[in-house]
Amino acid sequence: MTYSLNTLNSDAAHHATRGLARYAQELGLLFGLIGLVFWGLALASYNLTDPAWTTSGNGSPTRNWGGGIGAFLADGSYALLGLSVWLCWAAGMRSWMAALARWMRGGVPEAGEPSPRLRRLSFWSGLVLLVVAGTALEWSRLYRLEGLLPGNAGGALGYVVGPFAQKWLGFNGAGLLCIALMVPVSYTHLTLPTNRE
């Protein structure tokens, strides 16, 4: 008589996701990966001469690897958040990998893992703080990169938050606060280490 792996060690209170919910989870993982790869390719191949949201282009063919849709997506992303949009892309990849790990475990939470509500709240609040601090820092320190972007360095969010921080904290104070927010927030809120041995 044979048993599948971990059958005798399974907890009766936690059952793996089955049926339609499992199928929806798999489709979500597949479409999430496709979307993240497309967004990453569109951002990586951004060109200022492509016709998009902030520009009509110069009449040449679209050079973005995502075509016209990719040009619009990359242009809008860079216009809104500047180069800090890559923080959102990296957080999206990390979130996708965490969802993949949950799917591979069958949807059964590990012992010591925080509740889904706490995990989501911590992740999203950390990401918002990280992006706000990143765009403000980009606006105040990396303004030489404006020639590569469709708008201001730090995008529209950096254009709003950066001057506010610099007005109230000064040039050095705003930079120190943004760095002080970015380093611990990116570690504590976006990683959430679990009790693994």
Task: Name each model feature, range by range.
Residues 1-190:
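Alpha-helical transmembrane segments used as membrane anchors
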Residues 189, 195-197:
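Single conserved hydrophobic/aromatic residue that forms the stacking wall/gate
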